[in-house]
């Protein structure tokens, strides 16, 4: 076993004798990991791992101080990374030197297992590093035959049992066990000038027996069983003379390559030995860690990164660097290998001690958490619930499309793997019938298909005809695809643009049972078509007369003020582009706001097999559909009521988006030519409501335009309606006009419609999206600068904390530990497993402690306490920071918006402003 630990060779599985294994004592895992180092964590038995022969060769070279020579035969059948099943892990320690190493039994996966569409990718075991211990590097006086071992005061008080200070001098006897179970007795005394903690009697015996020298380290651990454990770490001193019994370096290299190649070809088990103190890097890593780093973290030359390194006395430190290149380490022998494929340059002058090349899974790019790209450009504010219908299909090429950034020489086999257990592709989760929740997914699929003008992706023409309400305020008047193309293409010459968009259209789902029932009901309405047309014409004429008579009574200055207000809210009509532009009737709109006529003029459509409806029949149909799409009617040109009614929690989501036009000059010239002849296109169309969520207003004035994409269309963040948020959040002089509004295409005199009066003022949204309370709008605008930040921890209620009370990270961690019952665990996150992250003002998620304190105070928005389990499951990006645990009472609307604007840890995908589902 000593040969195995020092050489790190590969042996067939049969070479490990069961009798020899039984003779090995069960080592203490906590003490073994402490001796191995703070960054070492062995994978879990039974999990899938990735084995790198290159890394194994580096361990042999480091142990023998001899690199692998070129005359060593190559094994073309041995891939640069081998996915294996980890069958067994045994921890060992050398009997003479206490050098720790691990024996692992691996078995390569068969080709059939690699093709498994749901290949498990376990996250591996938790880091078994101890939490209550101290490590000290020995000095010359510590290793001398007199004087004893000086223990730092805080370390002695933390790890050793308390002294009895009634004695003079205070003293006690300590009994500590090493890795082999041997007990060592020391006398612990508190004496001297100044007084200090010393280990006297028994210490020199221990130093002599272990042959410790200055530079070596000693660890004392107080475990959960109230036992004192003792371990040593020897300084990395290169061996000048290898024992004659040890095999040559070339023999070791050939042995490990031959054993791995044979196991890969025969799908048999093989055994390796991992020496964490001698190996430069881990060469057996969990499969999930490999996939997350290689296929779900985007890097580029020039990107900044940080990397953890072990420092003195078992502590760790992050060193900064810059990526200078991405290439194979040994393209001739190991092509397409990800082992040390990243060239880096280190910032500090001591960079000579660190490797010039690193692997992807060893570094942390200075961005948000790793990106999990989706084939659809819509980024959800909340995790997509399991079973809810998604806006895209779960095709096999969805995963591969997100991996196009990889080098062309990358192994395509890994791209076909679906790691569903990590939550990397939520669209692959099982779904149930959306009608159980009262949803109408097909209506949204139809809208998306209509927007891109792909008739093959549409559910049915009859569903499009359901989208023909009569009221202008927040209603849509949708045409069939053939009629839309006839109207739009001659005007805007968009054939090539639509052809490109058709390639990215979304597949619609089958019609829901609800729509089929409503269609059957509406078929009976067609028999009453003449009567309904007559009634509709009478209602329209009466409504027109009432509007004109009321508008005559409005003073002229009030009309001008009303038009001015409507211009301010130009960006917030109930419109959805591009199909708001593609769904106009074939008649022009009036020129003034006071004489607006309804769009719902009778039109005829070709009959379909399911009895298509004319617009005159839709009034009765909307009464039937009202429970699922309840909107209070918009009153055009009516005075604003003083009493604001409480909005319906099922009120529709309304968004206003920019027009899909090639360029401003081209559109302006075209609009001037079409001013007198082309029909005016309404900019209002309604999107049927999704239950339980309301649109939010993006209050960030410096929004990134890439953060507002819906169906591939840029959305102006200021044009998103919030239930009750517009009057309080927008001033009268804040003009947010839609682009191209200077042309006749979106002239204010033609398309200024008042907002729906059912929107209340400054209504507060709770976590479920409903409106439980109402607050004064002045409280939203004139809210004093907040010095409190929200702190969240899973399983408990959130807390508010004034961070200006503290002057350092240590005080903050201590206070958070007291508030959440985590005393002593937040100060040492790497040992306890608990981690602190925060969201800054730019919605980036960062680790607490990396920035200067004052910069952190000025930029922090909220803090999240992550448990060890959450830190383990960082591969599930949609679960972290997506929502605060517990119900937070009394929050204002802007607090709610700021929480929803926080980006999650796994995602990194551009936000869609305030669109929520």
UniProtKB/Swiss-Prot annotation:
Subcellular location, principal: nucleus
One Pfam family hit: B3
Tissue expression profile of the protein: Expressed in roots, culms, leaves and young panicles.
GO MF terms, alphabetically ordered: DNA binding
Keywords: Auxin signaling pathway, DNA-binding, Nucleus, Transcription, Transcription regulation
Region of interest: Disordered: 571-649
GO BP field: auxin-activated signaling pathway; regulation of DNA-templated transcription
UniProt GO cellular component terms: nucleus
Record localization: Nucleus
CDD domains, per database record: B3_DNA
Positions of the PB1 domain: 786-870
Record has Transcription as a keyword: yes
Biased segments, Low complexity type: 576-594, 604-620
Quaternary context: Homodimers and heterodimers.
Free-text note regarding domains: Interactions between auxin response factors (ARFs) and Aux/IAA proteins occur through their C-terminal dimerization domains III and IV.
Primary role: Auxin response factors (ARFs) are transcriptional factors that bind specifically to the DNA sequence 5'-TGTCTC-3' found in the auxin-responsive promoter elements (AuxREs).
Name recorded for this polypeptide: Auxin response factor 17
Source organism (scientific name): Oryza sativa subsp. japonica (Rice)
Gene expressing this chain: ARF17
